[in-house]
Amino acid sequence: MPEYRSKTSTHGRNMAGARALWRATGMRDGDFHKPIIAIANSFTQFVPGHVHLKDLGQLVAREIERVGGVAKEFDTIAVDDGIAMGHDGMLYSLPSREIIADSVEYMVNAHCADALVCISNCDKITPGMLMAALRLNIPTVFVSGGPMEAGKTKLAEHKLDLIDAMVIAADDSASDEKVAEFERSACPTCGSCSGMFTANSMNCLTEALGLSLPGNGTVVATHADREQLFLRAGRVAVELCHRWYGGEDPTALPRGIATFEAFENAMTLDIAMGGSTNTILHLLAAAQEGEVAFGMQDIDRLSKRVPQLCKVAPNTPKYHIEDVHRAGGIMAILGELARGGLLHTNAATVHARTLADAIAQWDVTQTDDENVHTFYKAGPAGIPTQIAFSQATRWDSLDTDRSDGCIRDVAHAFSQEGGLAVLYGNIARDGCVVKTAGVDESIHVFEGTARVFESQDAAVKGILADEVVAGDVVVIRYEGPKGGPGMQEMLYPTSYLKSKGLGKQCALLTDGRFSGGTSGLSIGHASPEAAAGGAIGLVREGDRILIDIPNRSINLLISDEELALRRAEQDAKGWKPVEVRPRKVTTALKAYALLATSADKGAVRDKALLDG
């Protein structure tokens, strides 16, 4: 039977010094025979998705200790992509994922913790902690801070989010007063931004992976029901310890839960709900950490068979995450996918023996349990606040309309092809990704003229200066993991294309990535990236590019001979931007770039370089 890892420092005469230090943290004689459970919190006052987490780690800690464990909390960093957006701060966003993963590994392994509770929420924090959990492979449960309530204003017919504030700010026809009103109304509460952006997408995917509890991705941060998720997460962590250390149950460990089948389930959910393209990057990275052979080809295969069953902002202004919860949350989407024969329902979870058992218990269309129905009626209060669990508003009814509601059944899908697709061609040999859920069907096949920019900054200037016109393909390169470095999000270029009325008349292609708030014909993660010799680095001003989503292709319309000639010329010059870019690349960023792989590998470290 496995022994507690913590015995390394809590047992034996020669560990008297270590025990003395443990005692200084508050441990007593009886605690040295209990599991030590690490709580990885991510509280910070910089990020609205994390500003309310300060006391929640101790909430979990008290529950762990009430049911027989010893809790030890620490914090990791959290970067706000929205605040870091549009300047050199965004260079640090994706690299922070690796720092978060490393910091969790460092703390847990240095102190020989027996289990882990991950309190995450925003864009890189959930993926970073997920990578760490799969590296460590000790009993782990995730609980997120929860989504922000959607904003409201009398100046808009629909609810608001961060993207609305960004788009209106670049609209020359909007008054300063209207911009100010949107700014004040778009982000009213604590929590992760209210649409199906990267943070909420990832928190929803942890439900499908089996590593978090039902409602983790959809109960708003302000609602009292989320407190019960935190308390239950503490209890589950102790239960997982008993199952592993007391019974050697492999499904108590992350790698026993997040198997290949579970990754397929998570990606199937992602495609069905039109999640952020960043989720592809993060799932690929997590799979590598868990030694799961899940790759771009698997995502491509799934994207061709999974329909889109849920459509949420930024893909429509009608629904936000709070509306997904009212419709039954992630368990309801998983239920529809299961009935369509699209899931591996025998996959394990931290809270139920199988996913099938979880769906039977939590799918609002399948259970008569009033407690479950009440849980999914948890709604927004519409009161600006930064305090968790501060309201208990409930919808009068659930949205169970599966033919015309927020969540659809397979027969009434928003589209029979899902919300994400992988494209291949001579411009992206190893693939690139597009969120089809946000692309108007009229431009699913698009041929346009290349407008080439060597940085996001240059592209923004060009778009705002009206240098981009209808029919153009904006190409932004040398913004990949190595080339940026850091693979910046291109939210400002896509938002400004909308502001200029070009959202349905142009395409954007980059080796960088996109915010979960992006919509339109925005194609990212072009692999290999330009800095790694990718063909996106060979595109020239005025070239024609053909994008064909139905046939999953993207091609630069030049001959193979011309492409080879350009490659030889570029090899001689070196793969770097033509123009010197005014950005400060620090030693920390250079270290990240040195080991970073392209997006098709999840932009993780190249282990071949480390292994020598």
Swiss-Prot record:
Superkingdom of the organism of origin: Bacteria
Reactions accelerated catalytically: (2R)-2,3-dihydroxy-3-methylbutanoate = 3-methyl-2-oxobutanoate + H2O; (2R,3R)-2,3-dihydroxy-3-methylpentanoate = (S)-3-methyl-2-oxopentanoate + H2O
Gene3D superfamilies per UniProt: IlvD/EDD C-terminal domain-like
Positions bearing N6-carboxylysine: 124
UniProt keyword list: 2Fe-2S, Amino-acid biosynthesis, Branched-chain amino acid biosynthesis, Iron, Iron-sulfur, Lyase, Magnesium, Metal-binding
Comment on bound cofactor: Binds 1 [2Fe-2S] cluster per subunit. This cluster acts as a Lewis acid cofactor.
Obligatory cofactor(s): [2Fe-2S] cluster; Mg(2+)
Catalytic residue positions: 515
GO biological process: isoleucine biosynthetic process; L-valine biosynthetic process
GO CC annotation: cytosol
PROSITE patterns in UniProt: ILVD_EDD_1 (PS00886), ILVD_EDD_2 (PS00887)
UniProt pathway annotation: Amino-acid biosynthesis; L-isoleucine biosynthesis; L-isoleucine from 2-oxobutanoate: step 3/4; Amino-acid biosynthesis; L-valine biosynthesis; L-valine from pyruvate: step 3/4
Residue numbers binding [2Fe-2S] cluster: 122, 193
EC annotation from Swiss-Prot or TrEMBL: 4.2.1.9
Binding site for Mg(2+): 81, 123-124, 489
Name of the top EC class for this enzyme: lyase
InterPro entries (UniProt xref): Dihydro-acid_dehy_C, DihydroxyA_deHydtase, DiOHA_6PGluconate_deHydtase_CS, ILV_EDD_C, ILV_EDD_N, IlvD/EDD_N
A Gene Ontology molecular function term of the record: dihydroxy-acid dehydratase activity
Family to which the UniProt record says this protein belongs: Belongs to the IlvD/Edd family.
Function statement: Functions in the biosynthesis of branched-chain amino acids. Catalyzes the dehydration of (2R,3R)-2,3-dihydroxy-3-methylpentanoate (2,3-dihydroxy-3-methylvalerate) into 2-oxo-3-methylpentanoate (2-oxo-3-methylvalerate) and of (2R)-2,3-dihydroxy-3-methylbutanoate (2,3-dihydroxyisovalerate) into 2-oxo-3-methylbutanoate (2-oxoisovalerate), the penultimate precursor to L-isoleucine and L-valine, respectively.
Subunit structure as annotated in this protein's UniProt entry: Homodimer.
The protein, known as: Dihydroxy-acid dehydratase
Organism: Xanthomonas axonopodis pv. citri (strain 306)
Gene designation: ilvD
